[in-house]
Amino acid sequence: MAISKEDVLEYISNLSVLELSELVKEFEEKFGVSAVPVMVAGGAAAGGAAAAAEEKTEFDIVLTDGGAKKIEVIKIVRALTGLGLKEAKDAVEQTPSTLKEGVAKAEAEEAKKQLEEAGAKVELK
């Protein structure tokens, strides 16, 4: 009895990620091929599209400038981070400073909005 494509696909869909990775390596060795995607002409445009498709899910909130209303910014930094007054003041005055790391996109954007409304400059990395 011959094995159909559907049987092969069903078998592959039931593999764990580790087993699938090992299978790909064996294919590469046996057939002398590579699983690396081929770059096409106009690579810069394709690279931008790939980056957009692979959207980040975790962000670092980096304060780049405390702005003119430092007291208001310090209050927001304290509320966002739970830092004490001195630590928050140092973070606002010694820029750039990373306020939070590995934050969800929605939380990072909300923090950025609050800080920018107070006059600070913020980057999400």
Curated annotation (Swiss-Prot):
In the UniProt record, the signal sequence range is: none
| Molecular function terms from GO | mRNA binding; structural constituent of ribosome
Gene3D superfamilies (alphabetical): 3.30.1390.10, Single helix bin
Q: Which InterPro entries match?
A: Ribosomal_bL12, Ribosomal_bL12_C, Ribosomal_bL12_C/ClpS-like, Ribosomal_bL12_oligo, Ribosomal_bL12_oligo_N_sf
Supply the gene name.
rplL
> What's the protein called, per UniProt?
Large ribosomal subunit protein bL12
Q: Which keywords are on file for this protein?
A: Ribonucleoprotein, Ribosomal protein
Q: Which cellular components does GO assign to this protein?
A: cytosolic large ribosomal subunit
Q: What does this protein do?
A: Forms part of the ribosomal stalk which helps the ribosome interact with GTP-bound translation factors. Is thus essential for accurate translation.
Sorted alphabetically, which Pfam families does this protein's record hold? Ribosomal_L12 (PF00542), Ribosomal_L12_N (PF16320)
**Subunit:** Homodimer. Part of the ribosomal stalk of the 50S ribosomal subunit. Forms a multimeric L10(L12)X complex, where L10 forms an elongated spine to which 2 to 4 L12 dimers bind in a sequential fashion. Binds GTP-bound translation factors.
The UniProt family comment states: Belongs to the bacterial ribosomal protein bL12 family.
